[in-house]
Design a protein with these regions (language model features):
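Helical mechanochemical/support elements of P-loop NTPase systems and associated helical scaffolds
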Residues: 31, 35, 48, 61-67, ...
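Conserved G1/Walker A P-loop phosphate-binding module
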Residues: 1-111, 139
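Conserved Switch II/interswitch segment of TRAFAC-class P-loop GTPases
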Residues: 40-45, 72-82, 93-155, 168-182, ...
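C-terminal-of-GTPase-core extension/linker across diverse P-loop GTPases
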Residues: 2-6, 11, 17, 146-260
Length: 260
């Protein structure tokens, strides 16, 4: 599985990536610190695999892996090429699911591209750029279908789906919330590889002080949770900076931070 870590500049994407992969990707207090996507592959521990290996005397044990892609910060106008946006959007299109990092902490030492902390505005900014990119994909598909359907009536169903999808996205809705009429439409929709159709989980990046109650006292986290619930997505609370510091410890030191 390949997961893409996305968000605005300076929200903690590369810091989270480093905590997950120990890759040491650059993270700094300025926009577009990441330009080319950083990629890290993390094995998924599974005790059952060890048991099976012993039972069958396996010479080699290959665990499942998750590939994380740290994608450079998106900005308003990314779908039109702002901030190297087209390149970044194409990187997102290659992943299976999206981890959307949203900043829910105050820190005057870390600049925010819009000047203040507002995670819902940040989410809307990213989602709009994904929507615009999807609409461009659908427009090109629609133009091709209009020409092809004249000689192949079997494409009528796909053309109808594309037109309904275009209207749905133009109204500001995400493709993942589109209701298909049958299994064939579901397969067609998946084949379009739309960004807003990909499963999304929101990573609410908080300060260390907010970890004790899992962000329950943080108003910004509450807003993200409410938004995600309406969208049908999940939220997890993390202090990416602390997680990165823990990831850099040796194995013995890490044990005191692990919850069983």
């Amino acid at each position: 599985m390949k997961l893409g870590i996305v968000g605005l500049p300076n929200v903690g994407k590369s810091t989270l990536f480093n905590s997950l992969t120990k890759a040491g990707a650059e993270s700094a207090n300025y926009p577009f610190c990441t330009i080319d996507p950083n990629v890290g592959v993390v094995p998924v521990p599974d005790e059952r695999l060890d048991v099976l290996a012993k039972m069958h005397n396996s010479a080699k044990v290959v665990p499942a892996v998750i590939e994380f892609v740290d994608i450079a910060g998106l900005v308003k106008g990314a779908s039109k090429g702002e901030g190297l946006g087209n390149q970044f959007l194409s990187n997102i299109r290659e992943v299976d699911a999206i981890v959307h990092v949203v900043r829910c902490f105050e820190d005057t030492n870390i600049v925010h591209v819009d000047g203040n902390i507002d995670p819902l505005r940040d989410i809307e900014t990213i989602n709009l750029e994904l929507l615009f990119s999807d609409l461009e994909i659908l427009e090109r598909r629609h133009a091709k279908l209009v020409k092809s359907v004249k000689g192949d009536k079997s494409l009528t169903k796909e053309l109808d789906l594309v037109e309904r999808l275009q209207k749905f996205l133009e109204d500001g809705s995400l493709a993942k919330n589109f209701e298909v009429v049958d299994e064939e439409e579901e397969k067609l929709l998946a084949s379009f590889n739309l960004l807003t159709y990909k499963p999304t989980i929101y990573a609410a990046n908080v300060s260390e002080d907010d970890l004790a109650d899992d962000g329950a006292s943080n108003e910004q986290v509450a807003k993200v949770r409410e938004y995600a619930k309406k969208e049908g997505s999940e939220v997890f609370v993390i202090c990416a900076q602390i997680e990165q510091e823990i990831a850099e410890l040796d194995d013995e030191e890490k044990k005191m931070f692990i919850l069983y």
